[in-house]
Amino acid sequence: MSISNSIRAQIPPIHPEGYPFIGAFALVSLILFWIFAPLGWIGTLLTVWCALFFRDPIRVTPQREGLVVAPADGRISMITRALPPAELGLGDRPLLRVSIFMSVFNVHVNRSPVAGRIEKIAYRPGAFINAELDKASEDNERNSLAISTPHGKIGVVQIAGLVARRIVSFVREGQTVGAGERFGLIRFGSRLDVYFPDGTEVLVSEGQTAIAGETVLADFDVAVPGLTFRSQ
């Protein structure tokens, strides 16, 4: 492998959702260079940051029924019991919830935590308060998915934040998804909540760093040995 190929192999691809933003930053940078060179360099740095924000690295997802993987990169900010969004139809009792906070420096492509069928997708407009606050799950703009699995339904909620103002979904109701498959993206910082069926025990703790499609949040079949992996 040539040096150039080796370098390219280390650079993660950019998600197409980012192309318009990167192009806009690059155009502004060129204009700033023409006006005042130091401003142009600042614009260039912002363009590079924008490209990094929309990076979409390949992830190696463990493939075994019963595993629940992280749907987002970020820090596990909260593990608690909470009522799931009413629009998902997951019941009116509190469920175990794991919240992952994504800063503006994390990868923001979201991945399905499980293999299953998307039973419900529900978008709800709302506010844009700090996504780290507990009340953000109730007050902020959100896009919720209910995914049916042999172990019960999993709720996945994309929550907009203080900076994030656009939730993007790549999937539709009735679609079958694989664990680790890309299902959406949130622009510029946000949060993902995962709601688990009763009886689930999570394998992570608050403050832990999660990697989308790779970090195992829970295992419904802890007694089943053997894992295979799939890059995607």
UniProtKB/Swiss-Prot annotation:
Catalytic residues identified in the record: 190
InterPro entries: PS_Dcarbxylase, PSD-A
Modification(s) after translation: Is synthesized initially as an inactive proenzyme. Formation of the active enzyme involves a self-maturation process in which the active site pyruvoyl group is generated from an internal serine residue via an autocatalytic post-translational modification. Two non-identical subunits are generated from the proenzyme in this reaction, and the pyruvate is formed at the N-terminus of the alpha chain, which is derived from the carboxyl end of the proenzyme.
Subcellular location: Cell membrane
UniProt cofactor(s): pyruvate
Disulfide bond residue pairs: none
Keyword tRNA-binding attached: no
EC number: 4.1.1.65
Subunit structure: Heterodimer of a large membrane-associated beta subunit and a small pyruvoyl-containing alpha subunit.
Identification of the protein by name: Phosphatidylserine decarboxylase proenzyme
